[in-house]
Amino acid sequence: MAEEEERGPGSVYQMFVLMEDLLDKLKVLDYEQHVLDKHNIKPLSRHYFVSSPHVLSNPGEQFYMFSVIAAWLITLCGRPFDTPQEYDDPNATVSNILSELRTLGGQVDFPPSKLKTGSGEHVCYVLDQLVEKALKSKGFAWNRPLYPSVEVEDECVQEDDAELTLSKVEEEMTQEDEEYEEEDGLDLDALKTRTNGELSGSRPAVVLESDVDAAEWNLEVERVLPQLKVTIRTDNKDWRIHLDQMHQHQDGINTSLQDAKGCLFKLREDISKTLEKVSSREKYLNTQLEHLISEYRQAQSQLNKVKELYQQASGGVTERTRILAEISEELDKVKQEMEEKGSSMSDGAPVVKIRQSLTKLKQEIEQMDVRMGVVEHTLLQAKLREKNNMTRDMHATHLLEPNAQAY
């Protein structure tokens, strides 16, 4: 099946139409007896193989139904094909069905994985191709539809009345025109002759100006205007025909309502029974799964507690991660300083400078020692000189004291 390059907005619903046609063709082949009764399967719904969010789906059941119907259709075409089982490999089943379809002349231009879901456009396409081949092998031919004859007597009467009404209107308008032309009509021949005479003359040298009086023109228009109105007379038969049609439609609606009322009541009863079954099944499932629900609630509460503990632990981990980042930053700084100091220690230039400085210090110390020795020697000589002077002065003082006593 070749994919369309441009798909219109109605292509979404084409699958529903294809499925309905497929179901009608399966009913023609009497699939209820040969497939449903044989495998103990419930009848298909109108949109069973349609893939849509508005239709309930069961991929496992739909794929099994697809494989069983496809196998039955292949056997109807005269090809031997074993009925697939639920435990068979889906890939092998799909591959066998597509190979048989190609053998029968069908076109397959999509991957086999499209059929594993059991629903969708490709599933409907494969089944439709197989059912067409089966109908062809059975020699089945569709008859032309027979359309019921429709009574059109009322419409014919209405059309005849309409034609009569229009003919009357035309006759009345013709009579009014003739009377108007006889009484107040214009002399068209004289006007035509005058116009031709003016056109045949030479072209005027100046622009012509109209000499018509506007007031007289308006009076003439007001006088002629009532005679130009067309009045269409209403036909009294129209509303009676419409009333008869309304009564006929009402009778048809009442008849159809009586026929459909029984089906609607039956449908309501079926829906009520189905709802009761669903509610009872729901209650049964609730009672069976009550302990699992309680366990689930306990597990949910434990999960919430574990989440709280995890959040607390994650908060501590975040704080420790921040501290670790700060310590790592400080460690990087220390490593950088150590590398700088190591590089400076491995360099010999500072050592040479230190040695030169030590040598210079030794020389300066020697010079200072010499200066200190000179200063000490000078100081010692000064002290000795001062001591000698003091001694001399003391001897002189002792010698002067006896002489003074003698006097």
Curated annotation (Swiss-Prot):
Q: What is one Pfam family matched by this protein? A: IFT57
UniProt note: phenotype after gene disruption:
Fishes show ciliary defects. In retina, cilia are generated but not maintained, producing the absence of photoreceptor outer segments. A loss of cilia also occurs in auditory hair cells and olfactory sensory neurons. In all 3 sense organs, cilia defects are followed by degeneration of sensory cells.
Domain of life per record = Eukaryota
Which positions make up the signal peptide? none
* InterPro entries in the cross-refs: Intra-flagellar_transport_57
**Coiled coil region boundaries:** 158-186, 283-373
Annotated stretches, region: pDED: 313-404
Give GO terms for biological process. Answer: apoptotic process; cilium assembly; determination of left/right symmetry; epithelial cilium movement involved in extracellular fluid movement; eye photoreceptor cell development; intraciliary transport; non-motile cilium assembly; photoreceptor cell maintenance
Subcellular localization(s) per the UniProt record: Cytoplasm, Cytoskeleton, Cilium basal body
The answer to keyword Coiled coil applying to this record is yes
Give the record's keywords alphabetically: Apoptosis, Cell projection, Cilium, Coiled coil, Cytoplasm, Cytoskeleton
> A cellular component term (GO) from this record?
Golgi apparatus
Stated role: Required for the formation of cilia. Essential for differentiation and survival of sensory neurons. May also have pro-apoptotic function.
The family line of this record is: Belongs to the IFT57 family.
Name of the protein described by the UniProt record? Intraflagellar transport protein 57 homolog
Species whose genome carries this gene: Danio rerio (Zebrafish)
From the UniProt record, report the name of the gene that encodes this protein.
ift57
